[in-house]
UniProtKB/Swiss-Prot annotation:
Organism of origin: Homo sapiens
Pfam families: PWWP
Limits of the PWWP domain: 490-550
PROSITE patterns xrefs: PWWP (PS50812)
Comp. bias regions, Basic and acidic residues: 208-217, 296-305
Keywords of the record: Phosphoprotein, Transcription, Transcription regulation
Self-association state and partner proteins as the record states: Component of a MTA1-specific subcomplex of the NuRD complex composed of PWWP2B, MTA1 and HDAC1 but does not contain CHD4 and MBD3. Interacts with MTA1 and HDAC1. Interacts with MTA2, MTA3, HDAC2, RBBP4, RBBP7, BRCC3 and ZNF516. Does not interact with CHD4 and MBD3.
SMART domains: PWWP
An example Gene Ontology CC term for this record: nucleus
Name this polypeptide is given: PWWP domain-containing protein 2B
GO MF terms, alphabetically ordered: NuRD complex binding
Length: 590
């Protein structure tokens, strides 16, 4: 008898493994084997649509067709679509152990008809195990693919990767001094309002000048006679000496050192108000009019008002005392350049008086070292880079008592001021770095020994400086020969150096030769435009080197970004890219 859908067949359970039954059934001359799964468990395939309830029909001919009745071991009859087999401890007929089928999830299919492939839609149960068994290597419905959450890699500054544009770099000299150092070195500007009094603080161990606590007074404000009697003479003397408003001061410092001649020197640094910018005045030798008592000098230093705003204490400069017969130093003058036209080649500088560090000109006194030309240069250049040490060694020409000496401080802590000629090229190359709009530099440099002298000015009229004009003759040339014999022409691609940046490629825009009216040695400088930057600068000819010849020496392999882009632009502008340059550019690209 051929099996058909809905018929019942006795099966033989061969093995039971983890809720699955391995069964065999013989139908005529053919034998079938398979695995029956427990559909009541939630592991594996579950939620299968149950079959329609079959009619209770005696299938005695089916059993007779095998020629034998089922044995006792084969008494358990398995039904397709039924639940788990009955428990082993109770042997009951299959009809009584068959549970009620759950309500069908999908409409039941008529007996004997199967779809070509199981329908699948959202929320539908998994197909029947026999359907999966009959569809090996065929189309099998799969659940929808689950969404895989991918974490997006965070870019720098949350930028779109397609819009990563290299920002332009502005080649400007870096600031060497901080705000405190600049306020210490530059003269304070006069503020419209009254100067703010320094905050009175009590500091431990402030030396012999620390405040003494006054004895308590009664509520009516009148001190008692006993408290007055207990006061010592020293307390009353210090209370009378102290000003109305107590200001914390620094302790008195004494420093002893030996001179090359073997003599011992002692420098006494008097007490000063915290935050004052008054420079250190070393104790001078006794004068003809008689020496003053150190206590009197100490009292005068206390009573001197502090007219400078509160700031940090400047660095102490220990200089040797100046001989008594030294002349007074000339006043300091700053030169302000005026904007030049397109056709002008002679820059005109206006001279104006530069105030002292504390904002006013002090009265005449034995010439202190801090006010001399060398001391002034040292004060203006202190705190900057190591190259400023050359600035202190400028030769000082002999100056008269009423002579005017030009002095220009390096702006923003610029170095390269070591030159004997007026407006030296080394001091103008980095200080005159400007933007593409061609803004002129703030100051020029004139060393004291070579400046033009003005008419004699009385000491009372030092506050006003007569108009003074210094004309510097400049000439534009197309090419120039350096000291080592190389020729630099307009349009050349060269390497240039600015403080705070690596060697950077640039194009020469103009070459200027300068000379003073009195025939002093000229200087040679070039105006260059930087590749990859909108800025232009004035550099000394001696600081320029050819781009191709010095490529291996100047190229920095560690720099990326705009530096690499500027190198590529300079190589293309040179109209030929040497093989070694191309190899270096492509070797380190990422």
């Amino acid at each position: 008898m051929e099996p058909r859908a809905g018929c019942r067949l006795p099966v033989r359970v061969e093995q039971v493994v983890n809720g699955a039954l391995v069964v065999t059934v013989s139908c005529g001359e053919r034998s079938f084997a398979g695995i029956l799964l427990d559909c009541t468990k939630k592991s594996g395939l579950f939620g299968l649509p149950p079959l329609a309830p079959l009619p209770q029909v005696d299938e005695s001919p089916v059993n007779d067709s095998h020629g034998r009745a089922p044995e006792e071991g084969d008494a358990e009859v398995m039904q397709l679509g039924s639940s788990s087999p009955p428990p082993a401890r109770g042997v009951q007929p299959p009809e009584t152990t068959r549970p009620e089928p759950p309500p069908p999830l999908v409409p039941p299919l008529p007996a004997g008809s199967l779809p070509p492939y199981p329908p699948y839609f959202e929320g539908a149960p998994f197909p029947h195990p026999l359907w999966l068994r009959d569809t090996y290597k065929l189309w099998v419905p799969q659940p929808p693919p689950r969404t895989i959450k991918r974490t997006r890699r965070r870019l720098s500054r949350n930028r779109d990767p397609g819009r990563l544009i290299l920002s332009t770099i502005r080649l400007r000299p870096r600031q060497v001094l901080c705000e405190k150092c600049k306020s210490t070195l530059s003269p304070p500007e006069a503020s419209p309002g009254p100067p703010a009094a320094p905050r009175a603080r009590r500091r431990l161990g402030s030396g012999p000048d620390r405040e003494l606590r006054k004895p308590e007074e009664p509520e009516n404000g009148e001190p008692t006679a006993a408290a007055t009697a207990r006061r010592s003479k020293r307390e009353r003397r210090e209370e009378d000496r102290a000003p109305a408003e107590q200001v914390p001061r620094s302790p008195v410092i004494k420093i002893s050192y030996s001179t090359p001649q073997g003599k011992g020197e002692v420098v006494k640094i008097p007490s000063r108000v915290h935050g004052s910018l008054e420079p250190f005045r070393p104790q001078q030798a006794p004068q003809d009019d008689g020496s003053q008592d150190p206590e009197v000098l100490d009292r005068e230093s206390r009573d001197r008002p502090s007219c400078a705003p509160s700031a940090s204490i400047p660095k102490l400069k220990l200089t040797r005392p100046v001989p008594a017969g030294a002349d007074l130093p000339p006043p300091k003058i700053r030169l302000k350049p005026h904007r030049l036209g397109d056709s002008e080649h002679e820059p005109v500088y206006r001279a104006e008086l530069v105030g002292e560090l504390n904002g006013y000109l002090r009265d005449s006194s034995p010439a202190p070292c801090a006010d001399g030309p060398a001391g002034g240069l040292a004060d203006l250049s202190s705190g900057s880079s190591g190259e400023d040490d050359d600035f202190k060694s400028c030769p000082q020409g002999p100056q008269g008592r009423e002579g005017l000496a030009f002095l220009v401080s390096c702006p923003e802590g610029r170095a390269d001021c070591a030159s004997e000629s007026a407006c030296s090229s080394d001091s103008l190359d980095e200080a005159r770095s400007s933007g593409s709009e061609g803004t002129p530099a703030d100051t020029g440099d004139l060393s004291p020994g070579h400046g033009a002298s003005a008419p004699s000015v009385s000491r009372e009229a030092r506050q006003t400086v007569p108009p003074l004009t210094v004309r510097l003759h400049t000439q534009s040339v197309s090419e120039c020969i350096t000291e080592d014999g190389r020729t630099v022409a307009v349009g050349d691609i060269v390497w240039g150096k600015i403080h705070g940046f690596p060697w950077w490629p640039a194009r020469v825009l103009d070459i200027s030769l300068g000379q003073k009216e009195d025939g002093e040695p000229s200087w040679r400088e070039a105006k260059v435009s930087w590749f990859g930057s909108p800025t232009t600068s004035f550099l000394s000819i001696s600081k320029l080197s050819p781009f191709s010849e010095f490529f291996k020496l100047r190229f920095n392999r560690k720099k990326k970004g705009m530096y690499r882009k500027a190198i590529t632009e300079a190589a293309n502008a040179a109209r030929h890219v040497a093989p070694e340059i191309r190899e270096l550019l492509t070797q380190f690209e990422t």
